[in-house]
Amino acid sequence: EEFGVDESIASFVLPLGMTINMDGTAIMQVIATVFIAGCAGYTVTPGQLVVVALLALLASVGTPAAPGAGAVILFTILSGMGFVNDGALLAYSLILAINRPIEMLVTSLNVVGSICVAKSEGLLKEDVYNK
């Protein structure tokens, strides 16, 4: 209520939206997959990029909101695309090493996406929010 969101929406829609609306997670998965493929010597075709984007989008919907969950999903996408040689695993370990600050940025993007949805649906009481 302090932020201008009705209690009925905050108790049901926000938890559901935070699980389903993970834009930052999907974007990070695609960027990390392309980075890892490039480091490992794979050539990513436009068709493969579309498949990676679809996999990341679908996987991000079911990704739990827990630290490190995105890294597990990333490995699943890499395995599904066949990017599993030694170079890919080394690049994946580099992503794991810097994953904590990346997750903070990804979470920020997820929250901004949820706020944009709330604003576009008219669910945000601006007079309360702007106080």
Model-based region annotation:
Residues 1-16, 42-46:
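Membrane-embedded helical hairpins/re-entrant loop segments and their flanking transmembrane helices
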Residues 1-5, 19, 118-124:
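Helix-loop junctions at the membrane interface of multi-pass solute transporters
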Residues 4-12, 28, 93-97:
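Juxtamembrane loop-helix boundary motifs flanking transmembrane segments in multi-pass membrane proteins
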Residues 14-21, 55:
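Alpha-helical transmembrane segments of multi-pass membrane proteins
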Residues 21-22, 106:
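Alpha-helical transmembrane segments of multi-pass integral membrane proteins
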Residues 22-32:
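Helical hairpin unit composed of two closely spaced alpha helices linked by a short loop
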Residues 30-131:
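Transmembrane alpha-helical segments and their short flanking loops
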